[in-house]
Amino acid sequence: MDEGYLDIGGNKIWYSVYGKEKKNTPILVAHGGPGFSSMPEVVSEFAEQRPVYFYDQLGSRRSDKAKSKDDYSVEYFVAELEGVIKALQFTDIILMGFSWGCGLIGSYMLEKKPASVKALILSAPLLSTSLWDRDQREHITKMPSAMIKAIENGERSGDYTGEYQTAMMAYYNRHVCRLNPWPDSLLEALDGLNMDVYQTMWGPSEFTVTGKLKDFDLYPRLHEITIPVLLTCGDNDEAGVKTLKDFQMAFPQAQMAVIPNASHLHQIEQPQIYKIVVNEFLKNQ
């Protein structure tokens, strides 16, 4: 693994690469959050066949922090992704996103229309906040009544502490990561979560959206992205199966895979199945 920093708009942005010497079309990974960071586990193993690049977005773990929380925006992150691609001098590339990283990639594709991007891998995608919220509300109805009430009270009052936090963690154990205990790699990444970025862009939890992404919606324009797309989610994913099917129908060239006995972090929960699915897609890219 090699790593370094790129100067993107005056900010130091960390990146790493696995399998740099490989000749197949490289993958560039956009992590989730916003405010999360790169997790090379599992995904770096695709470097057996091609280079795999990761980078931490502004505010995330190994990269610079913004001078002001107002600097965190979809527009900035799209420009940053474009800057990373230019700085690394890719001619052809496959973009892989996780959760918010999928929305970032989708925004980049629709705004910049890059000819260099040959395919997309979108795992547990956030592409429409309204559809995301539809999934969350459906999941919440299946929780114990006391937890439903705690979530409703928190959202009504704006107090996201106490019982709201307890309900939130119960929800995460069902729909974000079903492994027990959570793996060290996830705990380490969560320890580095930048809440300034997360709360500015998203909100206090995965199912309560109060930030800049509240009205985010690429769904009406997905038909404009005509390259091959692989969509994945877990069968218990907070990014729901029904919504994934809606996205598949919207993209002109999309296939989807639902990973069994898994949730939002299905690449960590079921790594062997995830690798088989992605490698099958990559055979033709």
Map each language-model feature to its residues:
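Conserved HGGG/HGGXW glycine-rich cap/lid loop of the alpha/beta-hydrolase fold
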Residues: 7-66, 70
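Active-site loop/oxyanion-hole signature of alpha/beta-hydrolase fold enzymes
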Residues: 53-100, 276
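Conserved hydrolase catalytic core segment
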Residues: 91-135
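Flexible "cap/lid" loop of the alpha/beta hydrolase fold
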Residues: 118-162
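Alpha/beta-hydrolase
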Residues: 152-227
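Catalytic active-site module of serine/aspartate enzymes centered on a nucleophile-bearing elbow/loop
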Residues: 253-285
